[in-house]
């Protein structure tokens, strides 16, 4: 498997999409042993919990599935995506909101969480003066949030985020609301600044720009 961007673990020479720490390989209730670079497969995997490295042995795939299910971790990608979509729609309906469910964003957040939890947040209504496209781009592209609309299809100041755990103390909600507040303050500043510029002159300035495909990121 080739990756555009790879990482390696410590001083080992193995490059992968993410640093590999261990390989769990079992079949028919038996451990299949093989060597891949510096790693030797086993029936043990590492579980990060409260910043501690803990090990867990598995004798079968059934045992493996049961363990993660008990931790509310959804291993199956399709089931995890469906769970997120269903929860988003259910909460939005309960709040009398319409959710902007972008399929690319849904796929992206599905792949960055293990035990998804939907959290409803909001930003200051004064930012609704900014054009919808700017607000939606800020929420979807930069923050991975799901914007919402009211029954008249007007963008609201409510949005949903998909967290990777329960927000018991409400810190995830507050933290994300603070982050989007800063983002929207920046967006409003540049929007207000752009409104003072002459549009025709701005278009003519595009002639001064040069575009190079594949340069930078």
Q: Model regions: which residues?
A:
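Long, basic N-terminal domains or extensions that often function
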Residues: 1-129, 133-135
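Catalytic nucleotidyl-transfer cores of nucleotide-processing enzymes
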Residues: 100-216
């Amino acid at each position: 498997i080739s990756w555009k961007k790879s990482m390696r673990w410590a001083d080992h020479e193995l490059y992968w999409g993410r640093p590999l720490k261990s390989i769990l390989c079992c079949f028919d209730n038996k451990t299949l042993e093989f060597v891949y670079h510096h790693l030797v497969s086993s029936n043990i995997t590492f579980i990060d919990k409260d910043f501690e490295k803990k090990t867990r042995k598995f004798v079968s795939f059934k045992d493996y599935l049961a363990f993660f299910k008990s931790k509310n971790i959804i291993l199956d990608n399709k089931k995890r995506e469906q769970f997120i979509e269903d929860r988003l729609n259910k909460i939005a309906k309960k709040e009398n909101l319409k959710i902007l469910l972008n399929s690319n964003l849904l796929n992206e957040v599905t792949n960055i969480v293990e035990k998804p939890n939907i959290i409803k947040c909001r930003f200051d209504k004064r930012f609704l003066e900014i054009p919808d496209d700017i607000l939606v781009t800020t929420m979807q592209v930069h923050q991975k949030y799901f914007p919402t609309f009211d029954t008249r299809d007007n963008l609201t100041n409510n949005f949903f985020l998909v967290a990777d755990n329960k927000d018991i103390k409400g810190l995830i909600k507050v933290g994300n609301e603070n982050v989007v507040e800063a983002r929207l303050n920046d967006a409003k500043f540049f929007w207000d600044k752009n409104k003072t510029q002459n549009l025709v002159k701005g278009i003519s300035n595009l002639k001064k720009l040069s575009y190079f495909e594949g340069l930078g990121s």
